[in-house]
Amino acid sequence: MWWPMLWAFPVLLCLCSSQALGQESGACPDVKIVGLGAQDKVAVIQSCPSFPGPPGPKGEPGSPAGRGERGLQGSPGKMGPPGSKGEPGTMGPPGVKGEKGERGTASPLGQKELGDALCRRGPRSCKDLLTRGIFLTGWYTIYLPDCRPLTVLCDMDVDGGGWTVFQRRVDGSINFYRDWDSYKRGFGNLGTEFWLGNDYLHLLTANGNQELRVDLREFQGQTSFAKYSSFQVSGEQEKYKLTLGQFLEGTAGDSLTKHNNMAFSTHDQDNDTNGGKNCAALFHGAWWYHDCHQSNLNGRYLPGSHESYADGINWLSGRGHRYSYKVAEMKIRAS
């Protein structure tokens, strides 16, 4: 019984030695089958791994997993550029009408009574405003003898102030070559050039004495003036005739006295004394012309010296008939 086992022992020992030897040399031993008898045992000696075989076929996809829980909200991203403005929406329906308010209390003075009170107590001239403490040059409301309000430019700076300006030329922005009706009613721009109106001139000068001042400024900046003791304009029925007082003083000299007692003329109404010629049309203005003029302050706005004769803003005793002034103002003040 022991003999087969004793015989097998050397064989196994030999195989183990061979295996060890094969591992040292790097070769893989073969698989050996030991014992073929019925009572013999089979011993398998493991060899070295060989090269991997080819990959097997792809398996079927597995069933999808369930949806995971929602993650935490991330931080907001950078704001994009603003979009274009949308179209305006349709107008909504009107709101509910409010309740009627309480009736106001009656005024102690009616419209007529209030106007009469203002007329009685209101200023009649720029000189009147000056005596009431108004010292700034500007536009103010005064009241005519018939109680109508009138907005006028008050010069509170020149020669003691209190002057009501009725003619102003400063930049040529207003056309002064106008018809009779325009000069009757007045025209111009409150901020630049204007003619107050012959009807208003008549009302302002009809009662009480008004002195006249003419202020002139050249394009080079030199200034001059002329002053007269009185100035009055008749009504339209007398063609707005000029009644002028004595020349008092002035660096511009006297170029208006020759026009005393003359009617006003425009290009469509010739009231001068120049025979068959219309001085207003001839010299492109409107004035108290005789045959024709020594002054023409409503003439064309020309840039200083000019070649044309006597059709600019001229004052003969100042710069002559061929020089047109940059600025001309005519103003009256109660004396």
From Swiss-Prot:
Amino acids binding Ca(2+): 270, 272
Residues bound to a carbohydrate: 291-293
Region (A domain) residue spans: 123-162
Signal sequence extent: 1-17
GO-annotated molecular function: antigen binding; carbohydrate binding; carbohydrate derivative binding; metal ion binding; pattern recognition receptor activity; signaling receptor binding
Membrane topology summary: Peripheral membrane protein
GO biological process assignments: cell surface pattern recognition receptor signaling pathway; complement activation, lectin pathway; G protein-coupled receptor signaling pathway; positive regulation of interleukin-8 production
GO CC, one annotated term: collagen-containing extracellular matrix
Subcellular location: Secreted; Cell membrane
Segments of this protein annotated with the region Disordered: 47-114
Region (B domain): 163-251
Biased composition annotated in UniProt, kind: Low complexity: 75-88
Domain Collagen-like: 50-88
Glycosylation: residue positions: 271
Keywords: Calcium, Cell membrane, Collagen, Disulfide bond, Glycoprotein, Immunity, Innate immunity, Lectin, Membrane, Metal-binding, Repeat, Secreted, Signal
The organism's place on the tree of life at top rank: Eukaryota
Mediates specificity for sialic acids (site feature) positions: 309
One matching Pfam family: Fibrinogen_C
Domain Fibrinogen C-terminal: 117-335
Residues covered by region (P domain): 326-335
InterPro entries the record matches: Collagen, Fibrinogen-like_C, Fibrinogen_a/b/g_C_1, Fibrinogen_a/b/g_C_dom, Fibrinogen_C-term_domain, Fibrinogen_CS
Note on domains (UniProt): The fibrinogen C-terminal domain mediates calcium-dependent binding to carbohydrates and tethering to the cell surface in monocytes and granulocytes. The domain undergoes a conformational switch at pH under 6.2, and looses its carbohydrate-binding ability.
Annotated family: Belongs to the ficolin lectin family.
Subunit structure: Homotrimer. Interacts with elastin/ELN. Interacts (via Fibrinogen C-terminal domain) with FFAR2. Interacts with CRP; may regulate monocyte activation by FCN1.
Record function comment: Extracellular lectin functioning as a pattern-recognition receptor in innate immunity. Binds the sugar moieties of pathogen-associated molecular patterns (PAMPs) displayed on microbes and activates the lectin pathway of the complement system. May also activate monocytes through a G protein-coupled receptor, FFAR2, inducing the secretion of interleukin-8/IL-8. Binds preferentially to 9-O-acetylated 2-6-linked sialic acid derivatives and to various glycans containing sialic acid engaged in a 2-3 linkage.
Protein name: Ficolin-1
Primary gene name: Fcn1
